[in-house]
C-alpha cells in the first residue's frame, strides 16, 4: 500500500553557485559527507547535488511532515547501489518518523535536464 508520494524540482544553478562560492558551511548543512564525496568529483557535481536535494524535499513531502518535527537535511541522504540506482539512507528523526508512519520502503527516482533536477519518492507499507 502506498503511504505517500512526493515530488520536487530544483534549479541546478543554485547548487552551481554554492560550489563556485565554496560555501562549505551550507553544503555541510544540506548534505551528508558521503553525498558530498560522491558528487564533488563528478563533472556535473551541481546536477548531482541538486538531484539529491530534490530527493530530500520529495521525501519530506511524501512523509507529510515537511521539515517540522526536528528533521535535519543530513538525516535524509541519497546513496547509490552497485548499479548506480539511487536509494534513501535515513537516520535520526527522519528514520523515526518514517517508521512511525508504518513505512517499510521508500522508492526514489532522480533526473536532471534543462537546468533542473527532479526527484520523486514513494513511501510504501509492508
Swiss-Prot record:
Positions contributing to Mg(2+) binding: 8, 57
Signal peptide (UniProt feature, chain positions): none
A single cellular component GO annotation: cytoplasm
Predominant place of localization: cytoplasm
Cofactors required: Mg(2+)
GO function terms (MF aspect): holo-[acyl-carrier-protein] synthase activity; magnesium ion binding
GO terms for biological process, alphabetical: fatty acid biosynthetic process
SUPFAM superfamilies xref list: 4'-phosphopantetheinyl transferase
UniProt catalytic activity: apo-[ACP] + CoA = holo-[ACP] + adenosine 3',5'-bisphosphate + H(+)
Classification via Pfam families: ACPS
EC number per UniProt: 2.7.8.7
Gene3D superfamilies registered for this protein in UniProt: 4'-phosphopantetheinyl transferase domain
Keyword Ion transport recorded: no
InterPro entries noted in UniProt: 4-PPantetheinyl_Trfase_dom, 4-PPantetheinyl_Trfase_dom_sf, ACPS, Ppantetheine-prot_Trfase_dom
EC top class named in words: transferase
Annotated function: Transfers the 4'-phosphopantetheine moiety from coenzyme A to a Ser of acyl-carrier-protein.
Family in the record: Belongs to the P-Pant transferase superfamily. AcpS family.
Protein name: Holo-[acyl-carrier-protein] synthase
Species assigned in the record: Trichlorobacter lovleyi (strain ATCC BAA-1151 / DSM 17278 / SZ) (Geobacter lovleyi)
Gene that encodes the chain: acpS
Amino acid at each position: 500500500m502506498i503511504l505517500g508520494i512526493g515530488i520536487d524540482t530544483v534549479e541546478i544553478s543554485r547548487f552551481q553557485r554554492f560550489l563556485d562560492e565554496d560555501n562549505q558551511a551550507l553544503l555541510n548543512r544540506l548534505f551528508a559527507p558521503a553525498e558530498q564525496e560522491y558528487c564533488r568529483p563528478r563533472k556535473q557535481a551541481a546536477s548531482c547535488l541538486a538531484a539529491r536535494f530534490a530527493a530530500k524535499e520529495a521525501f519530506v513531502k511524501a512523509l507529510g511532515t515537511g521539515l517540522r518535527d526536528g528533521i535535519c537535511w543530513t538525516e535524509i541522504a541519497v546513496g547509490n547501489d552497485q548499479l548506480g540506482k539511487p536509494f534513501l539512507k535515513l537516520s535520526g528523526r527522519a528514520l523515526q518518523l518514517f517508521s512511525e508512519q508504518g513505512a517499510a520502503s521508500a522508492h526514489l527516482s532522480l533526473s536532471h535536464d534543462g537546468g533542473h533536477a527532479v526527484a520523486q519518492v514513494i513511501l510504501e507499507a509492508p
